[in-house]
Amino acid sequence: MTVIDFTAEVEKRKEDLLADLFSLLEINSERDDSKADAEHPFGPGPVKALEKFLEIADRDGYPTKNVDNYAGHFEFGEGEEVLGIFAHMDVVPAGSGWDTDPYTPTIKDGRLYARGASDDKGPTTACYYGLKIIKELGLPTSKKVRFIVGTDEESGWADMDYYFEHVGLAKPDFGFSPDAEFPIINGEKGNITEYLHFAGENTGAARLHSFTGGLRENMVPESATAVVSGDLVDLQAKLDAFVAEHKLRGEIQEDAGKYKVTIIGKSAHGAMPASGVNGATYLALFLSQFDFAGPAKDYLDIAGKILLNDHEGENLKVAHVDEKMGALSMNAGVFRFDEASADNTIALNFRYPKGTSPEQIQSILENLPVASVSLSEHGHTPHYVPMEDSLVQTLLNVYEKQTGLKGHEQVIGGGTFGRLLERGVAYGAMFPDSIDTMHQANEFIALDDLFRAAAIYAEAIYELIK
Protein backbone atom coordinates (compact mmCIF):
# COMPACT_ATOMS: atom_id res chain seq x y z
CA MET A 1 0.00 0.00 0.00
CA THR A 2 1.43 3.35 -1.05
CA VAL A 3 1.66 5.97 1.69
CA ILE A 4 0.86 9.44 0.37
CA ASP A 5 2.69 12.42 1.84
CA PHE A 6 -0.06 15.00 1.47
CA THR A 7 2.10 17.72 3.04
CA ALA A 8 4.74 17.17 0.35
CA GLU A 9 2.06 17.25 -2.34
CA VAL A 10 0.85 20.63 -1.07
CA GLU A 11 4.44 21.89 -1.02
CA LYS A 12 4.73 21.14 -4.75
CA ARG A 13 1.66 23.26 -5.46
CA LYS A 14 2.18 26.19 -3.06
CA GLU A 15 2.88 28.80 -5.70
CA ASP A 16 -0.09 27.75 -7.82
CA LEU A 17 -2.34 27.74 -4.75
CA LEU A 18 -1.29 31.28 -3.84
CA ALA A 19 -1.70 32.52 -7.41
CA ASP A 20 -5.27 31.23 -7.55
CA LEU A 21 -6.04 32.59 -4.10
CA PHE A 22 -4.67 36.03 -5.01
CA SER A 23 -6.92 36.13 -8.07
CA LEU A 24 -9.94 35.60 -5.80
CA LEU A 25 -8.84 37.98 -3.05
CA GLU A 26 -8.34 40.81 -5.53
CA ILE A 27 -12.08 40.80 -6.21
CA ASN A 28 -14.23 42.96 -3.95
CA SER A 29 -17.10 40.53 -3.46
CA GLU A 30 -19.08 42.45 -0.86
CA ARG A 31 -22.84 42.31 -1.29
CA ASP A 32 -24.10 45.53 -2.88
CA ASP A 33 -27.88 45.67 -3.14
CA SER A 34 -27.72 49.09 -4.82
CA LYS A 35 -26.24 47.40 -7.89
CA ALA A 36 -28.24 44.18 -7.74
CA ASP A 37 -30.28 43.08 -10.75
CA ALA A 38 -31.42 39.87 -12.44
CA GLU A 39 -27.88 39.10 -13.61
CA HIS A 40 -26.26 40.12 -10.34
CA PRO A 41 -28.60 39.04 -7.52
CA PHE A 42 -26.31 40.38 -4.78
CA GLY A 43 -24.40 42.92 -6.85
CA PRO A 44 -21.54 42.49 -9.33
CA GLY A 45 -18.77 41.61 -6.85
CA PRO A 46 -20.03 38.21 -5.68
CA VAL A 47 -20.78 37.21 -9.29
CA LYS A 48 -17.27 38.15 -10.41
CA ALA A 49 -15.73 36.04 -7.64
CA LEU A 50 -18.01 33.09 -8.41
CA GLU A 51 -17.09 33.28 -12.09
CA LYS A 52 -13.38 33.38 -11.25
CA PHE A 53 -13.68 30.30 -9.03
CA LEU A 54 -15.56 28.35 -11.70
CA GLU A 55 -13.00 29.51 -14.27
CA ILE A 56 -10.25 27.95 -12.13
CA ALA A 57 -12.23 24.70 -11.90
CA ASP A 58 -12.82 24.73 -15.68
CA ARG A 59 -9.10 25.19 -16.24
CA ASP A 60 -8.39 22.13 -14.13
CA GLY A 61 -10.78 19.94 -16.09
CA TYR A 62 -13.82 19.76 -13.80
CA PRO A 63 -17.37 19.94 -15.18
CA THR A 64 -18.85 23.16 -13.74
CA LYS A 65 -22.30 24.68 -13.41
CA ASN A 66 -23.29 28.28 -12.64
CA VAL A 67 -26.84 28.46 -11.27
CA ASP A 68 -27.94 31.91 -12.44
CA ASN A 69 -25.09 33.68 -10.62
CA TYR A 70 -26.50 32.72 -7.22
CA ALA A 71 -24.14 29.81 -6.68
CA GLY A 72 -22.20 27.25 -8.64
CA HIS A 73 -20.53 23.89 -8.37
CA PHE A 74 -18.16 21.45 -9.98
CA GLU A 75 -18.13 17.69 -9.63
CA PHE A 76 -15.44 15.04 -9.34
CA GLY A 77 -15.58 11.25 -9.37
CA GLU A 78 -18.39 8.76 -9.65
CA GLY A 79 -20.60 6.92 -7.20
CA GLU A 80 -24.08 6.83 -5.74
CA GLU A 81 -23.10 8.63 -2.55
CA VAL A 82 -22.19 12.30 -2.82
CA LEU A 83 -19.85 14.24 -0.55
CA GLY A 84 -20.79 17.91 -0.51
CA ILE A 85 -18.19 20.60 0.14
CA PHE A 86 -19.77 24.00 0.79
CA ALA A 87 -17.83 27.26 0.56
CA HIS A 88 -18.55 30.89 -0.29
CA MET A 89 -17.05 33.71 -2.31
CA ASP A 90 -18.85 36.67 -0.73
CA VAL A 91 -17.19 38.65 2.06
CA VAL A 92 -18.33 41.05 4.75
CA PRO A 93 -17.67 44.75 4.11
CA ALA A 94 -14.02 45.67 4.55
CA GLY A 95 -14.83 48.60 6.82
CA SER A 96 -12.11 50.91 8.08
CA GLY A 97 -8.95 50.53 10.13
CA TRP A 98 -6.85 48.55 7.64
CA ASP A 99 -3.08 48.96 7.39
CA THR A 100 -3.17 47.68 3.80
CA ASP A 101 -5.68 47.78 0.94
CA PRO A 102 -8.14 44.98 1.83
CA TYR A 103 -8.39 44.00 -1.86
CA THR A 104 -4.67 44.07 -2.59
CA PRO A 105 -3.47 40.77 -1.07
CA THR A 106 -0.30 41.42 0.89
CA ILE A 107 2.13 38.92 2.41
CA LYS A 108 3.96 40.21 5.47
CA ASP A 109 5.75 38.24 8.18
CA GLY A 110 4.33 34.95 6.97
CA ARG A 111 0.75 36.22 6.92
CA LEU A 112 -1.51 36.87 3.95
CA TYR A 113 -3.62 39.98 4.55
CA ALA A 114 -6.85 40.62 2.62
CA ARG A 115 -10.60 40.65 3.15
CA GLY A 116 -11.59 37.01 2.68
CA ALA A 117 -8.15 35.60 3.50
CA SER A 118 -9.57 33.58 6.38
CA ASP A 119 -13.30 33.90 5.64
CA ASP A 120 -13.65 32.18 3.28
CA LYS A 121 -11.53 32.46 0.14
CA GLY A 122 -8.34 31.20 1.79
CA PRO A 123 -9.88 28.04 3.29
CA THR A 124 -11.89 27.46 0.09
CA THR A 125 -8.74 27.53 -2.01
CA ALA A 126 -6.91 25.25 0.43
CA CYS A 127 -9.79 22.77 0.22
CA TYR A 128 -9.90 23.08 -3.57
CA TYR A 129 -6.23 22.16 -3.75
CA GLY A 130 -6.82 19.25 -1.39
CA LEU A 131 -9.25 17.78 -3.90
CA LYS A 132 -6.98 18.74 -6.80
CA ILE A 133 -4.20 16.61 -5.30
CA ILE A 134 -6.51 13.57 -5.25
CA LYS A 135 -7.46 14.22 -8.88
CA GLU A 136 -3.91 14.74 -10.10
CA LEU A 137 -2.57 11.68 -8.29
CA GLY A 138 -5.32 9.56 -9.83
CA LEU A 139 -6.31 8.06 -6.48
CA PRO A 140 -9.13 5.48 -6.58
CA THR A 141 -12.46 6.77 -5.30
CA SER A 142 -15.93 5.29 -4.79
CA LYS A 143 -18.02 8.40 -4.17
CA LYS A 144 -18.78 11.61 -6.03
CA VAL A 145 -17.74 15.04 -4.77
CA ARG A 146 -19.81 18.13 -5.43
CA PHE A 147 -17.93 21.30 -4.50
CA ILE A 148 -20.57 24.03 -4.07
CA VAL A 149 -19.72 27.72 -3.82
CA GLY A 150 -22.22 30.38 -2.74
CA THR A 151 -22.35 34.16 -2.91
CA ASP A 152 -24.60 35.19 0.02
CA GLU A 153 -23.32 33.28 3.04
CA GLU A 154 -22.56 36.46 4.96
CA SER A 155 -26.13 37.75 4.61
CA GLY A 156 -29.32 35.77 4.21
CA TRP A 157 -28.20 32.53 2.48
CA ALA A 158 -30.57 33.33 -0.38
CA ASP A 159 -27.89 31.86 -2.65
CA MET A 160 -28.36 28.38 -1.22
CA ASP A 161 -32.14 28.69 -1.17
CA TYR A 162 -32.08 29.47 -4.88
CA TYR A 163 -29.40 26.90 -5.68
CA PHE A 164 -31.26 23.95 -4.21
CA GLU A 165 -34.55 25.08 -5.79
CA HIS A 166 -33.06 25.35 -9.28
CA VAL A 167 -30.01 23.09 -9.59
CA GLY A 168 -32.07 19.98 -10.34
CA LEU A 169 -29.98 17.71 -8.11
CA ALA A 170 -30.62 16.11 -4.74
CA LYS A 171 -28.70 17.43 -1.78
CA PRO A 172 -25.39 15.66 -1.08
CA ASP A 173 -25.59 12.78 1.39
CA PHE A 174 -23.05 14.22 3.80
CA GLY A 175 -20.45 16.94 3.78
CA PHE A 176 -18.50 19.74 5.35
CA SER A 177 -17.77 23.43 5.00
CA PRO A 178 -14.19 24.77 5.22
CA ASP A 179 -15.46 27.91 6.93
CA ALA A 180 -14.69 27.71 10.63
CA GLU A 181 -11.99 25.94 12.63
CA PHE A 182 -10.32 22.65 13.46
CA PRO A 183 -10.65 20.12 14.92
CA ILE A 184 -14.34 20.22 13.89
CA ILE A 185 -17.59 22.09 14.36
CA ASN A 186 -20.33 19.48 14.68
CA GLY A 187 -22.82 21.76 16.40
CA GLU A 188 -24.06 25.25 15.57
CA LYS A 189 -26.40 27.43 17.56
CA GLY A 190 -29.55 28.83 16.04
CA ASN A 191 -29.26 32.23 14.39
CA ILE A 192 -31.92 34.94 14.23
CA THR A 193 -31.92 38.72 13.94
CA GLU A 194 -34.60 40.66 15.80
CA TYR A 195 -35.28 44.34 15.18
CA LEU A 196 -36.26 46.89 17.81
CA HIS A 197 -38.40 49.65 16.26
CA PHE A 198 -38.65 53.25 17.50
CA ALA A 199 -40.42 56.41 16.42
CA GLY A 200 -38.27 59.46 15.66
CA GLU A 201 -39.67 62.18 17.91
CA ASN A 202 -37.40 64.41 20.02
CA THR A 203 -38.91 66.35 22.92
CA GLY A 204 -35.94 67.12 25.18
CA ALA A 205 -33.51 70.00 25.62
CA ALA A 206 -31.03 67.97 23.58
CA ARG A 207 -31.97 66.78 20.10
CA LEU A 208 -30.89 63.58 18.32
CA HIS A 209 -30.97 64.21 14.58
CA SER A 210 -29.41 60.92 13.55
CA PHE A 211 -27.52 57.91 14.90
CA THR A 212 -25.73 55.46 12.60
CA GLY A 213 -23.53 52.50 13.42
CA GLY A 214 -22.69 49.05 12.09
CA LEU A 215 -22.41 47.48 8.65
CA ARG A 216 -23.99 44.04 9.13
CA GLU A 217 -25.96 42.22 11.80
CA ASN A 218 -23.17 39.64 12.09
CA MET A 219 -20.42 42.18 12.74
CA VAL A 220 -19.67 44.12 15.93
CA PRO A 221 -19.91 47.81 14.92
CA GLU A 222 -16.44 49.29 14.92
CA SER A 223 -17.73 52.86 15.04
CA ALA A 224 -20.86 54.95 15.22
CA THR A 225 -21.76 58.56 14.53
CA ALA A 226 -24.56 60.74 15.89
CA VAL A 227 -25.63 64.25 14.89
CA VAL A 228 -26.93 66.19 17.89
CA SER A 229 -27.82 69.75 18.91
CA GLY A 230 -29.33 71.69 21.80
CA ASP A 231 -28.30 71.72 25.45
CA LEU A 232 -24.95 69.89 25.33
CA VAL A 233 -22.83 71.62 27.97
CA ASP A 234 -19.12 70.72 27.94
CA LEU A 235 -19.64 68.24 25.11
CA GLN A 236 -15.97 68.11 24.05
CA ALA A 237 -14.60 67.89 27.58
CA LYS A 238 -17.06 65.16 28.48
CA LEU A 239 -16.20 63.19 25.34
CA ASP A 240 -12.47 63.48 26.07
CA ALA A 241 -13.00 62.12 29.58
CA PHE A 242 -15.31 59.36 28.35
CA VAL A 243 -13.00 57.96 25.67
CA ALA A 244 -10.05 58.13 28.06
CA GLU A 245 -11.98 56.19 30.72
CA HIS A 246 -13.13 53.49 28.29
CA LYS A 247 -9.95 53.36 26.14
CA LEU A 248 -11.77 54.41 22.98
CA ARG A 249 -11.23 56.99 20.26
CA GLY A 250 -13.66 59.78 19.53
CA GLU A 251 -14.09 63.10 17.81
CA ILE A 252 -16.56 65.96 17.42
CA GLN A 253 -17.14 68.10 14.34
CA GLU A 254 -19.33 71.23 14.48
CA ASP A 255 -21.41 72.39 11.54
CA ALA A 256 -24.08 75.10 11.65
CA GLY A 257 -24.98 74.58 15.29
CA LYS A 258 -25.03 70.80 15.06
CA TYR A 259 -22.40 68.43 16.42
CA LYS A 260 -21.28 65.25 14.70
CA VAL A 261 -20.02 62.90 17.42
CA THR A 262 -18.11 59.74 16.51
CA ILE A 263 -16.79 56.97 18.76
CA ILE A 264 -14.51 54.23 17.46
CA GLY A 265 -14.22 50.78 19.06
CA LYS A 266 -13.16 47.49 17.47
CA SER A 267 -15.01 45.23 15.05
CA ALA A 268 -15.32 41.47 15.50
CA HIS A 269 -17.43 38.56 14.30
CA GLY A 270 -20.99 38.88 15.54
CA ALA A 271 -20.91 35.32 16.86
CA MET A 272 -18.20 36.42 19.32
CA PRO A 273 -19.31 39.90 20.36
CA ALA A 274 -17.10 39.95 23.45
CA SER A 275 -14.08 39.92 21.12
CA GLY A 276 -15.00 43.38 19.86
CA VAL A 277 -15.73 46.80 21.29
CA ASN A 278 -19.13 48.02 20.12
CA GLY A 279 -18.64 51.64 19.12
CA ALA A 280 -22.40 52.18 18.77
CA THR A 281 -23.37 51.11 22.28
CA TYR A 282 -20.56 53.21 23.76
CA LEU A 283 -21.67 56.25 21.75
CA ALA A 284 -25.22 55.75 23.03
CA LEU A 285 -23.94 55.47 26.60
CA PHE A 286 -22.02 58.71 26.20
CA LEU A 287 -25.00 60.60 24.78
CA SER A 288 -27.46 59.25 27.34
CA GLN A 289 -26.07 61.66 29.97
CA PHE A 290 -27.64 64.59 28.11
CA ASP A 291 -31.27 65.72 28.27
CA PHE A 292 -32.88 63.77 25.43
CA ALA A 293 -36.53 62.74 25.72
CA GLY A 294 -39.19 60.65 24.01
CA PRO A 295 -38.27 57.85 21.59
CA ALA A 296 -34.81 59.38 21.10
CA LYS A 297 -34.12 58.92 24.81
CA ASP A 298 -35.47 55.36 24.72
CA TYR A 299 -33.22 54.62 21.75
CA LEU A 300 -30.09 55.87 23.51
CA ASP A 301 -30.96 54.34 26.88
CA ILE A 302 -31.58 50.88 25.42
CA ALA A 303 -28.49 51.03 23.22
CA GLY A 304 -26.18 52.44 25.87
CA LYS A 305 -27.48 51.10 29.17
CA ILE A 306 -29.02 47.73 28.27
CA LEU A 307 -27.20 46.53 25.15
CA LEU A 308 -23.72 47.69 26.19
CA ASN A 309 -21.61 44.56 26.82
CA ASP A 310 -24.78 42.46 27.16
CA HIS A 311 -23.14 39.66 25.19
CA GLU A 312 -25.26 36.86 26.71
CA GLY A 313 -28.56 38.72 26.96
CA GLU A 314 -28.61 39.08 30.76
CA ASN A 315 -29.79 42.70 30.71
CA LEU A 316 -32.35 41.89 28.03
CA LYS A 317 -33.59 38.99 30.20
CA VAL A 318 -33.22 36.49 27.33
CA ALA A 319 -30.14 34.65 28.62
CA HIS A 320 -30.25 30.87 28.22
CA VAL A 321 -27.68 28.09 28.57
CA ASP A 322 -27.82 24.55 27.18
CA GLU A 323 -25.55 21.91 28.69
CA LYS A 324 -24.15 20.79 25.33
CA MET A 325 -24.54 23.88 23.15
CA GLY A 326 -23.58 26.53 25.70
CA ALA A 327 -24.92 30.03 26.20
CA LEU A 328 -26.99 32.32 23.99
CA SER A 329 -25.04 35.27 22.60
CA MET A 330 -26.26 38.65 21.39
CA ASN A 331 -24.65 41.15 19.02
CA ALA A 332 -26.16 44.61 18.59
CA GLY A 333 -25.05 44.92 14.98
CA VAL A 334 -26.79 47.73 13.09
CA PHE A 335 -28.14 51.06 14.39
CA ARG A 336 -30.20 53.43 12.25
CA PHE A 337 -31.99 56.51 13.64
CA ASP A 338 -33.21 59.54 11.70
CA GLU A 339 -35.50 62.07 13.35
CA ALA A 340 -37.48 62.40 10.12
CA SER A 341 -38.24 58.68 10.05
CA ALA A 342 -41.19 57.05 11.75
CA ASP A 343 -39.33 53.73 11.90
CA ASN A 344 -35.87 53.66 13.47
CA THR A 345 -34.18 50.40 14.32
CA ILE A 346 -31.58 48.48 16.26
CA ALA A 347 -30.75 45.04 14.84
CA LEU A 348 -29.93 42.39 17.44
CA ASN A 349 -28.35 39.17 16.17
CA PHE A 350 -28.86 36.19 18.49
CA ARG A 351 -27.00 32.88 18.40
CA TYR A 352 -29.19 30.67 20.55
CA PRO A 353 -28.89 27.07 21.82
CA LYS A 354 -31.57 24.45 22.17
CA GLY A 355 -34.17 25.27 24.80
CA THR A 356 -35.21 28.72 23.60
CA SER A 357 -36.62 30.11 20.35
CA PRO A 358 -36.87 33.30 18.28
CA GLU A 359 -40.50 33.71 19.32
CA GLN A 360 -39.65 33.37 23.00
CA ILE A 361 -36.89 35.97 22.64
CA GLN A 362 -39.25 38.28 20.75
CA SER A 363 -41.94 38.09 23.43
CA ILE A 364 -39.41 39.16 26.09
CA LEU A 365 -38.01 42.01 23.97
CA GLU A 366 -41.51 43.40 23.54
CA ASN A 367 -41.39 44.42 27.21
CA LEU A 368 -38.82 47.09 26.32
CA PRO A 369 -39.97 50.70 25.66
CA VAL A 370 -40.08 50.18 21.89
CA ALA A 371 -42.77 50.62 19.25
CA SER A 372 -42.50 46.99 18.17
CA VAL A 373 -40.16 44.02 17.68
CA SER A 374 -39.88 42.11 14.40
CA LEU A 375 -37.99 39.03 13.20
CA SER A 376 -35.79 38.72 10.13
CA GLU A 377 -37.15 36.56 7.32
CA HIS A 378 -34.16 34.22 7.41
CA GLY A 379 -33.01 32.27 10.43
CA HIS A 380 -31.49 28.94 11.33
CA THR A 381 -32.44 26.50 14.05
CA PRO A 382 -29.79 24.76 16.20
CA HIS A 383 -27.87 22.00 14.40
CA TYR A 384 -25.93 19.03 15.79
CA VAL A 385 -24.23 15.94 14.32
CA PRO A 386 -23.36 13.32 16.98
CA MET A 387 -19.74 12.50 17.75
CA GLU A 388 -20.43 8.87 16.87
CA ASP A 389 -21.24 9.71 13.23
CA SER A 390 -18.65 8.25 10.84
CA LEU A 391 -18.24 11.65 9.17
CA VAL A 392 -17.20 13.25 12.45
CA GLN A 393 -14.95 10.35 13.37
CA THR A 394 -13.15 10.33 10.01
CA LEU A 395 -12.49 14.06 10.04
CA LEU A 396 -11.22 13.99 13.62
CA ASN A 397 -8.96 11.02 12.89
CA VAL A 398 -7.29 12.84 9.99
CA TYR A 399 -6.86 15.97 12.08
CA GLU A 400 -5.25 13.99 14.90
CA LYS A 401 -2.96 12.10 12.53
CA GLN A 402 -1.65 15.22 10.81
CA THR A 403 -1.38 17.54 13.83
CA GLY A 404 -0.66 15.20 16.72
CA LEU A 405 -3.37 17.03 18.65
CA LYS A 406 -6.40 15.44 20.26
CA GLY A 407 -9.62 16.00 18.36
CA HIS A 408 -12.83 16.96 20.11
CA GLU A 409 -16.31 18.16 19.26
CA GLN A 410 -17.23 21.85 19.28
CA VAL A 411 -20.42 23.88 19.16
CA ILE A 412 -20.18 27.46 17.91
CA GLY A 413 -22.39 30.50 17.60
CA GLY A 414 -21.28 31.13 14.05
CA GLY A 415 -23.36 29.68 11.25
CA THR A 416 -21.82 27.80 8.33
CA PHE A 417 -23.09 26.05 5.24
CA GLY A 418 -22.29 22.79 7.00
CA ARG A 419 -25.71 22.96 8.58
CA LEU A 420 -27.37 22.72 5.16
CA LEU A 421 -27.08 18.94 5.44
CA GLU A 422 -28.42 16.74 8.22
CA ARG A 423 -24.98 15.10 8.23
CA GLY A 424 -23.04 18.31 7.69
CA VAL A 425 -20.27 19.90 9.74
CA ALA A 426 -17.67 22.66 9.49
CA TYR A 427 -14.01 21.66 9.30
CA GLY A 428 -11.16 24.17 9.46
CA ALA A 429 -9.35 26.11 8.36
CA MET A 430 -8.43 27.89 11.62
CA PHE A 431 -6.25 25.94 14.04
CA PRO A 432 -6.54 26.12 17.84
CA ASP A 433 -3.51 28.42 18.01
CA SER A 434 -4.60 30.64 15.10
CA ILE A 435 -5.44 34.30 15.63
CA ASP A 436 -9.05 34.88 14.59
CA THR A 437 -9.39 38.02 12.45
CA MET A 438 -12.58 37.11 10.59
CA HIS A 439 -14.87 40.13 10.05
CA GLN A 440 -12.15 42.45 11.39
CA ALA A 441 -9.79 44.99 9.90
CA ASN A 442 -6.44 43.49 8.87
CA GLU A 443 -7.95 40.04 8.32
CA PHE A 444 -5.23 37.50 7.57
CA ILE A 445 -4.38 33.83 7.34
CA ALA A 446 -0.95 32.52 8.28
CA LEU A 447 0.64 30.86 5.25
CA ASP A 448 1.73 27.88 7.33
CA ASP A 449 -1.89 27.39 8.43
CA LEU A 450 -3.11 27.70 4.84
CA PHE A 451 -0.80 24.96 3.62
CA ARG A 452 -1.36 22.74 6.68
CA ALA A 453 -5.10 23.00 6.09
CA ALA A 454 -4.71 22.03 2.42
CA ALA A 455 -2.88 18.84 3.42
CA ILE A 456 -5.56 17.98 5.99
CA TYR A 457 -8.31 18.60 3.45
CA ALA A 458 -6.59 16.38 0.89
CA GLU A 459 -6.35 13.42 3.24
CA ALA A 460 -9.79 14.00 4.76
CA ILE A 461 -11.54 14.14 1.39
CA TYR A 462 -9.70 11.03 0.26
CA GLU A 463 -10.66 9.12 3.41
CA LEU A 464 -14.30 10.08 2.87
CA ILE A 465 -14.51 9.08 -0.80
CA LYS A 466 -11.95 6.29 -1.30
Give the predicted meaning of each segment.
Residues 72-74, 226, 257-264, 346-348, ...:
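A generic structural motif
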Residues 186-212, 217-266, 270-330, 357-372:
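Acidic-enriched catalytic cores of C-N bond-cleaving enzymes acting on peptides and small amides
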Residues 63-67, 251-255, 332, 375, ...:
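Short beta-strand
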Residues 271-342, 351-366, 372-466:
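An extended, acidic, His-containing surface patch that forms the Zn2+-binding/catalytic region
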